[in-house]
Amino acid sequence: MIKKFDKKDEESGSGSNPFQHLEKSAVLQEARIFNETPINPRRCLHILTKIIYLLNQGEHFGTTEATEAFFAMTRLFQSNDQTLRRMCYLTIKEMANISEDVIIVTSSLTKDMTGKEDVYRGPAIRALCRITDTTMLQAIERYMKQAIVDKVPSVSSSALVSSLHMVKMSFDVVKRWVNEAQEAASSDNIMVQYHALGLLYHLRKNDRLAVTKMLNKFTKSGLKSPFAYCMMIRIASKLLEETEGGHDSPLFDFIESCLRNKHEMVVYEAASAIVHMPNCTARELAPAVSVLQLFCSSPKAALRYAAVRTLNKVAMKHPSAVTACNLDLENLITDSNRSIATLAITTLLKTGSESSVDRLMKQISSFVSEISDEFKVVVVQAISALCQKYPRKHSVMMNFLSNMLRDDGGFEYKRAIVDCIISIIEENPESKETGLAHLCEFIEDCEHTVLATKILHLLGKEGPRTPTPSKYIRFIFNRVVLESEAVRAAAVSALAKFGAQNDDLLPSVLVLMQRCMMDSDDEVRDRATFYMNVLQQKQKALNAAYIFNGLSVSVLGLEKSLHQYTLEPSEKPFDMKTVPLATAPITEHKTEIAPVATSKLPEKLAPSRQDIYQEQLSAIPEFQGLGPLFKSSEPVQLTEAETEYVVRCIKHTFANHMIFQFDCTNTLNDQLLQKVLVQMEPSESYEVLHYVPAANLPYSQPGSCYSLVRLPEDDPTAVSCTFSCTMKYLVRDCDPNTGEPDDDGYDDEYVLEDLEVTVADHIQKVLKPNFAAAWDEVGDECEKEETFALATVRTLDEAVNNIVSFLGMQPCERSDKVPENKNSHVLFLAGVFRGGHDVLVRARLALADGVTIQVTVRSTDDNVVDVILASVG
């Protein structure tokens, strides 16, 4: 049963767990000892420990065997041994879901719960509530009410916490105990007060007014429990976030007053709450930052760590607010706790001046090898932010990152470094060759397939444009010889890009491709054969379409369309235009540190927002036969934030139609809305075909209604339109407490903001990694050029942002970033116009008195070119 360990096992440490080799059948056999008389508490205790151990290890107990063991265990209530009795309570809780007829112990537990032994009463309450269902709850309601207000803190806390668990099961019954919970909230015991506040909040959390009243009551009367204060701060900050209240709110005043509390945990909780408030100004942050600054010099390591970690987060959005703490943070660089020292340095990197960068980097180098991977990632993210702030310091950063790349470390750490180097390369063209050289060195000995393929993709994209592209060929082909199938396939794709862009390298690349065609893996052979045939044609249009820019369709959409095509055999070839386009990737930098993922498994391809919309809309019968969804806009608010109804609109564009999805929320708890629709009146030749109303709109439960509109067929250039919108509905008054509506109702309407349809709603962003190749591929058959003057625009940055947002196209080659101190700039934009027509825009901008723009548009359709130029004009 329990293996006897020899000396070797003891020395290796494998014998440290005496329950390691337990067998369920043997333990259940031993459980028969429970039926013996007299009861042996020590032996029974040991067997119960084994049963609980097996249950917690995930061992499966059949219903019959679990029930038999449970019934045998109930005999142990005859013993008066305190430890054995409390072990019985634990076993009851563990076996409550797997045994039958567990309610047979109800009388024993009720007896202990109401008995004189205080040591039994709390655990008995917890065990009883674990086995009680909704039908039995009323039978113990009287005992629970008494226990909540009991003078013994452990009993009261047990009853309160058990009540909190039962709220999910029987909310209406537990709600009747609110008076007792309020009495417990005035207890002198800090844990009882905390648990009582928690129960009161969960009973009232769906009623904002009741929660506000509760907060006002306790802020006036005061609390003795620091835990309760922390919960109050969290509730107050949640309310502030929901109501979008500012620093003039009484709730904010309460949180700020907690900064002067005598308990450190309350002070920190208040500071943390203020720091994490959205749209918090520097003035509102100041008192919280002052408190955190004091904590930086605390003798307690936990407080120093909490302070510097929170200041680190503040520095991401408000670096100037943390500048006052720089001296305190400098002192923490030499802290004996490496985690604190790391956070101090990364915070200084965000708040420090350009002149302090070199010194800080040297200090990090002295101990970076001693800290964990998690904190190394934090350091790398701080360096990445610093590179954007001080681009001239990229050489110092690059050397530091290359040294870190050579050190040992896990996948997340290495990925953070690679991402940082790639961002430096993209932001600073002069650092490209140095960065690529470091990455080439890294993939020579890289055990992470994901990183190797990512770097090979970057080499294929950036390498051919460097002055000496041939030097990268060796590193890439080494991957074909030495690596796994996925890396070999990525290397073949990278090689093809060198051959397509550099005529001098083409013969050498073709020789290497021939070798790759002999590979043992299907994917590698197929890619090599495909690229070989494309490259041999020596046609720029083919290279652009099949090597540089590739497909720009949704992968999930392609999979579904192909599956549908195979289910319905057809003589016609598969049409790629039936597949929804992929939405362009979001490349903006995150402002917050993401938690380090522990999983190294490849993530399953998640459906995009547009894939989800496509599925939702295709399920509505009125929208059948519209074809693939072309584009979905971001939500547009049609009401103010604090109005009785909140309405936002998402515009879904198809080839010849638009669907307007109105997401409506009713914020009045005394009304039920029915047959809700938004009536639309267009200003142009758009035609409203059909309305799909929302059947019911109860209080605080969002619902959607739809309007189907046909686009103008006679004038393809008529893309812009303004709709006046009115929400129409049937109102039925209802009881705010029960939600029961009246039998009768009346029609009403609510005027919404006007809704604009612009040229951006007809264009889907598509990223072209190689814009020049795409420009040649489209050709100049449908090309037009015009010059415009923007008299009111004063900077190139502003002009670029205006053009990008207005046209709704994807900036390529990072041309949306205007270099400093430049008077001219070229912006490249790519997209697909509704109907599947490629459209490319090259805008040459010059700064003089205002900004002058020369716009050149190429497309596969003349009408699209006219639409773009007309909209810009």
Curated annotation (Swiss-Prot):
HEAT repeats, residue ranges: 64-101, 283-320, 321-355, 356-392, 395-430, 467-504
Gene3D superfamilies named among the record's database cross-references: Coatomer, gamma subunit, appendage domain, Leucine-rich Repeat Variant, TATA-Binding Protein
Biased composition (Basic and acidic residues): 1-11
Main localization of the protein described in the UniProt heading: cytoplasm
InterPro entries named among the record's database cross-references: ARM-like, ARM-type_fold, Clathrin/coatomer_adapt-like_N, Clathrin_app_Ig-like_sf, Coatomer/calthrin_app_sub_C, Coatomer_g_Cpla, Coatomer_gsu, Coatomer_gsu_app_Ig-like_dom
A GO term for molecular function: structural molecule activity
GO annotation, biological process: endoplasmic reticulum to Golgi vesicle-mediated transport; intra-Golgi vesicle-mediated transport; intracellular protein transport; organelle transport along microtubule; protein secretion
SUPFAM superfamilies in UniProt: ARM repeat (SSF48371), Clathrin adaptor appendage domain (SSF49348), Subdomain of clathrin and coatomer appendage domain (SSF55711)
Pfam families: Adaptin_N, Coatomer_g_Cpla, COP-gamma_platf
Keyword presence, Cytoplasm: yes
Keyword line: Cytoplasm, Cytoplasmic vesicle, ER-Golgi transport, Golgi apparatus, Membrane, Protein transport, Repeat, Transport
Membrane topology category: Peripheral membrane protein
Ranges where the record places region Disordered: 1-21
Transmembrane segment boundaries: none
Compartments in which it is found: Cytoplasm; Golgi apparatus membrane; Cytoplasmic vesicle, COPI-coated vesicle membrane
Summary of subunit composition and partner proteins: Oligomeric complex.
Role, per record: The coatomer is a cytosolic protein complex that binds to dilysine motifs and reversibly associates with Golgi non-clathrin-coated vesicles, which further mediate biosynthetic protein transport from the ER, via the Golgi up to the trans Golgi network. Coatomer complex is required for budding from Golgi membranes, and is essential for the retrograde Golgi-to-ER transport of dilysine-tagged proteins.
Name assigned to this protein: Coatomer subunit gamma-2
Organism this protein belongs to: Danio rerio
Gene transcribed to yield this protein: copg2
